[in-house]
Each structure stands twice: as C-alpha cells, then as structure tokens.
C-alpha cells in the first residue's frame, strides 16, 4: 500500500497535484518543472504520515532523541485522533489544548481555576477545521527545498508576512511538549540551574481554552517511527515558524501591514480573511507561568517570565525547521519588533530580567513534525531569548552547532532590544548558517532609519570582496604602462648594431671585389676567418674601454699579428692580405685602420699602425648604465634649458609688472601734485600773505615719507617730467627763497565759470551714494559713538590745521544735530578715520543717517557704531565732553557744492 501511495503521485497532472496539496491544507505555488518534484515528494510524505497516524490510533507519542531514548510520560495519549489528524493535515492545535504541558516530574502544573483549560473543557471537545489553518508552500532562493509558512499567522499572506517571523524580536512557535519533553538525563544534570535561577514569577492568568478549539498532538507517533531513518538535511518542513526557547509571538494584528516585497500583492485578499480569524483567536489566548523551574535549555520567559523544569523532568526539545521561511528584509522585521514592544494593539511583552543560562553544544536529533502555529500563544516567552536558530530548511529539531552560548541578565529596558539585535543567517544550504553577534546584549536599539541603514551595510559586508576599485585599476594601468616602456627600452638596449648580423658575419654582401677575384676559395675562407677573429677581438677591447674596465681602445699591428699567430700559424700569412682588403674596400666593416694620426689618410698597409673597432661589444649592464647616464644627462640639459626659459620669462614678466606699477604710481603722484597745487592756490586766494607758488622739493617732502623717498625717486622724477611735458595748468619757475634758487610750481587759475562747472572743490559734500534702509542701516541706535571712514587721505593733506576742515565739514553736514559733543581726527589713519561722540544713542543715530553713504571730497564715507568704553579708552578727554559743538561760521562751505550743483541743474532744466 505504501508503494502504491508512493508511485501514485508520480502520475498526477499539475491540476491534480495542486488539488491534492490543497486537500491537505496546503497552498502551493505554481507547478513548474523545478517545483513539481518537490511537490510530489511533499504529497508522498503527507500520505505516509496520514497512514501512520491511522495505524497508531490512540497510542502515545514516541520521541526521536538520538542522544538518549529516555521517554517522559506521554501526556498526549488522551488527546485523541482528532489532534493527530489535525497535525497531519497541517492544522495547528488550538491554544486551549494544553495536555502536552504535563510532565512526569510535575512539569508545567496548570492552575485548576480555569475550568476550560483542560481537555475536559468545552474547547477540548471540538476539533479545529482543517481549512482554518492553511500553510503556504514557498521556496528558498534556489527553489530547491520547500518552506511552509502559516498564512494566517502573519495576516498578510505570502512572503510579506512569512518574512516577518524571524526578526521581529520574537522566537518561532515551540514544538509540542508531547514531542519535546524528552531530554538526556545527563544533559539535564549538567544544565542544572544556579540557585538564583529558580526564582519564580507570580502565577499569571490561568489558561483557558477558546470555544470550538481542540488540541491534538498524536501525529508525533508516526513521526517517531520513521524519525531515525530520516535525513535532517532532506526533510522538508511543513511550518515556517517555530519557537526558540519557547517564545510567544506577539498577536499578529500588529503585523498585518508588513510587506517584504511587491511580488505577493495578489495574496492580500485571501490572507486578510485569515487575519480576521487569527485576531479573534488571539483575544482569548491566556498566558500562564510554570510553578517549577525548567533547565536552562528549556527556560521560557515571556518578557522575563522564568520557566524552568526540575532536575528529574525532561528538557524541552526545540525544533526550528524553517524558523522564519522567506524572511527577506531584516530591518523591516526589527521595525515590527519595535512596534510590538510599544504595544500598539498587541499584547504587552514583559521585559523582566532574563536569567543567565548556558546551552551545551550538543546537536539534538529531529524529534517531531513542526509545532502548530498557534501553540505559542499559550506559552510565555522572552523576547530577549538569545538562543541560536537553526535555519536549515530540512534541519528538523532545534540544534546548537556552535560552541556554548551565554546570556547575561538583561535590564527591563534591554530585554526587547537584545532580541531585536539578534541576527540570523538566511542561507538555507550552507554548512553553518548560525550567526551570533558578540554585542547582542549590550547593543542599544537603533531607530528605524539607522537600523535599516545598518542592515544594508551588513549585507554589503557579507558580499564578495572581489570588486576591483577604480583606485587599483588606475594603479594597474600605470604599472602596466611603465613595464611596457621599460621592456621596450631593455629590448632596444639588447639589440645588436646594424653593421653586424645576428650570426656574427660581417655585413658585406660581396667582400671580394674584382681585384681579389682570382684568389682561391681556400684563401678567401681563411681571410674571412681572420677578419672575424680581428673583429671580435677589437670589439671586445673597445667595449671594455667604453665600459671603463680597460684604458686601451686600439690594437697595434704587431699585437694583432701576435694574436693571430697564437690562434694558428695559418692566420699569420693572410694578415697582410686582410689589411689590404680593408683599405681597398672603403666601407665600414667594423674594423678601422689608423695611422700615427687619427685623421691621416692611409694608402698602403705599411702606413697602418693601429686597428680600432667601430662597433664596441658591451655587456647588457654596461649598455644599460651608459644609456641611463646618457638619458639622465640629456634630461638634465633639457630641464636646465626649460629652467632657463622659465627664468627669462619670469624676469620679463617681473619687469613688465614693475613698469606697470611704476607707471600707475607715477600717475597717482601726478594727481596728488595737482591736488596739492590746487589746494595751495585756493588757500592763497583766501590768505593773501601766502606765496602763489610752491617749491618742488617742498611738494615732494609733503607727499613722500622720508623712508620711501629713495624707493620712490624714480616715480617722482617721472611725475615731474610728465607735468613739465603734459600739464598746462602747472608752470615751472625759478625763485629765490631764503637766499637760494629753487624750482617752483605755480598753479595757473582757469576761468571762474569753468572752475565752478568742471572743477570739484576740495573738502565738500558731493551728494548721497545710496539711500538708507534696513539692509544697510541698523533700525536702532546702538551706542552714542561713531567711527567714520574715508573722510580724508593723510598723504594728500597739507599743513598743520587741515583736520579742522574735516571737523567743520562734519558739523556742517550735521547742522541740525545738537548732540555732537566730541570729534577726533586720526591724522595718521590710512583709512581717513574720524571719531564722533554724541550725548545719547539717539543723536548718534541721527548723525549716522546723515553721514553714512555720502560722497565727501571724492570718497565714499561709511559709518559704524563704536562702543563707549573703547571710545573713552582711545580718547580719555571725551569723558568730560558734554557741550554740543556747532559750525564755526554760517557759510556752510562744505555744502556749497551741493547748492551750486542743484542750482545748475535747475537752470539747465528751465532752459
């Protein structure tokens, strides 16, 4: 029968296979060539499990602990076949079915105050319909293993909600205790908790079974019979979530809007109906506490509730096959965990301290099929439970493959944060995919954008590091180019000269002309050998000389004859014939005959005194050294030439710049000289006692400081020459002053009308440059003191009382201001600064508006406020100044130009 059942699925069509899986409560994806074998295998397993459950009947469940087969008292024998059928059909047991919580040692004693908490209650009599808890068959990244995820668990359907189970700071649902309350007695002995671990929390509300629900765990027997033969790596899970250390999931209504990708939008309508049903059930799920401590491995703390078992009781075996199927976005899951912690419509998770426990590094064998999805709602679990999760798809029971894990006691504020910082690897087919962060307990919970950014960088860290950056690419290209040119140069240096072929023969096509045509062949061969020997000897000697290892470059005729005689007596007789052929040939054959002088012409062999090679034979390193020296020498010469050109250009540029600067200074000096002469002429008109001319040295000394006179001598001479040649208003005369003759300048006064129209008088206000507003004037007066800039040019001022004209101009401009009590002119200021003190800030503000932005003597006047203490520190005499200052006369000379210009404008407009 089993064989028939095994072969039957192979003959099913795609539609029949889909309907069969739907009949078992599964929701498969599209049937393709890659998914069909997996679906057939799953259907075969479901049928075998169904047959085994029918054979087992009401027998107690068996365990599959490969380490120790000590069997705890079966607590689900009375659960009946309904639960077994529900487990086989993929239906999760109701939260009220708590028969699996009973252990022989009094484990998990349940308060009797809840009449509906046992099987005898109303909830134990009804069976959950199979259609109420479909599971969705999905695939891992390579579609090689099947993952099943309860659709009604997340409330969103598809991968949107399957992905949220693993990283929400929660643990997957627990395995039924009927299947997992078996542990190795030795392991229980080793995992005996410390004395302070046994602290109990007050008992929580008693468990109540919602009406219409019935629990059953009899499917464990069928699994127990064939569990030893099953390969954990090839066993496909039926459920996608499982508790690690007995965590309790937060109600799923908080997660129904979670979306991990945009590929599962078509399942939202179907999954929303599951959400409504699941929400109605989650409202009635009570929480309970154990009255006896469990071993550390089975410690379950819902937000810090410590649940441990006695030493004699079994440990809680945990299965996490497909602990979080399809979880694709870690950061989204952590955001859901944060939402669950805040309790927005969800059960509040207790955050009491989690005790320190230790997990032995022993891998447990697969025990039972995965627990049903709503089982965890009746168990208290710690969101800070930090056991590792085995994410192998066919991994079977919970296994701890890494060395021992320790969990420190967490404060209440860090209990949930610790669980949210747990990282689980999603690689379903790697040898070891357990990740555990060292700073799990101490890492603070980050905000959602920070956590999402952190997870993105985490993904980048595990990505392959074989990317070739642009920096290394540039270095590689540069190195390749350098190597190319280096090899090219070395190849060039290693090449032979063009005069000698590669096999060493002389580069003479026909060494014997018509003159030697009658020579016998044997003599020709002997003569050629003689020339070869001489050529090699002379080339070696010349090469040694060029490389510096020998001081001799040439070989005398006697030495050459002795060398040939040492080689053989036959070469001695042919030596003269060879020399004659070299002289008669007239071509460069690599051997040169030299007489007593280097430029001596040779016509007979008797005149030949020395033999010299024209092609020195040098070693590779000698050639390289000579080439390096030659190239370096030429580069130095080139650089020297470039430097010389740059120096010449720089000097020319410097000369041009200096000439331009001297020309500009000359024109500035001319302007200053003209201003001095004009001002002196105006002063002479007012004061008839003054001479109408000025000595040229006196003008020079008034315009140029003593320390600059030597440097400015050339500029002054050019300015004097320019005035003599180009300025008609200045006349040069010779006058006797103080008994000595001096060259003087006299200003020739133009006509009065032209002066009034064209000539701008000195020390007068010439109008406003811009209007004052909030952008260039503060709305309130800050201090009673002002600092006025650009009122004068100290270089242009002549005499000792010129500062009085500046003070008079300020008082005339502010004639309507009766609050000015002190004016100080800084004669040495290059900015032409004048300081004014008023009686109050209001008077200072009035003066600010009158002076700021005005033209005075061709300069733009600017004003700013100055602190009173700094003003008194600079001018201590102003402390006692309280009398308002007034202009010395009523003519308002500094304002006359404004009246004149206004009058001219009006007259021109009327005409």
Swiss-Prot record:
Provide a GO CC annotation, any one: membrane
Phosphothreonine: modified positions: 209, 365, 883
The annotated regions of Acidic residues compositional bias extend over 217-236, 259-269
- Is this entry keyworded Isomerase? no
What residues form the membrane-spanning segments? 475-495, 628-648
Ranges annotated as biased composition (Low complexity):
63-89
Give the GO molecular function terms.
DNA binding; U1 snRNP binding
**A Pfam family this chain is assigned to:** LEM
Query: Which ranges carry the LEM domain?
Result: 6-50
Composition skew (Polar residues), residue ranges? 879-896
Complex and partners: Interacts with SMAD1, SMAD2, SMAD3 and SMAD5. Binds to both phosphorylated and unphosphorylated R-SMADS.
**What is the protein's given name?**
Inner nuclear membrane protein Man1
Q: Lineage of the native species?
A: Eukaryota, Metazoa, Chordata, Craniata, Vertebrata
